[in-house]
Amino acid sequence: MAYNTKRFHTPMFEQMLFPNDLEGVLMEMQFTPDMLAQAVRFRQTLVRNGLTRFNGCEAQWRRPVNVERVILVVGQVESDPSLKHGVQSIRTNLGLLKAVAQANADAHIVYKPHPEVWATLQNNGAYRHEMQLWCDEAVGNITLSELLPKVNEVHVMTSLAGFEALLRGKKVSCYGHSFYAGWGLTTDMVPMPSRPRQLNVDELVAGALFSYPRYMHRLEGKVRSTTPEMPLMKGLGSWRTEPAMLSARA
């Protein structure tokens, strides 16, 4: 869990609209060549091994033929605190899907619900029908590592999927205050005047994944301080289903 020390030690994702520690790091960090090289290696390893937040499913997805633009819309759990504090006019998955569909009538729109919402979508016929009115297809048990290489754009509210898409060089549109939005890497549907600095993706990785967090790795029954590469390199196979890494802000 990442905590924001600037506002009462509350979780950072609950303080999206206020100054926070990570934003301060990204605004002020002076990135060295060694830091950026480390970030490049880490990013390339993540992408090369197909690692995402949710792993384990090997189902494949085929991009439709003769379609110029495919947009992936990624839903969230609507009770997520980041949606309470980090969005403005669009606060629901249906609202996001409608906005994307209405603004991109020429695109093939793929909707990926959050894994915890997929079962609800499957079991609620009326809700499923309403969502399907605004997309060309909905996919559930398919990983982002399978989808992202095959789409042109990703649209999110505050989902971490937008960050994962940036790691893979995709165009990302944000409809909320994500930690990775506002730095010149995304198309931002809400203003973020507190972030005037322009970053590239490796500077974002260096700040958000290396400089800001503190990592603890459980190895042989002992918890040790580490960097993000160590557990990744030591246990790629097991990390796909059982993450071996915890992060906490000191």
Regions flagged by a language model, labelled:
Residues 1-250:
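Catalytic-core helical/loop segments in enzymes performing group transfer/polymerization on anionic/lipid-linked
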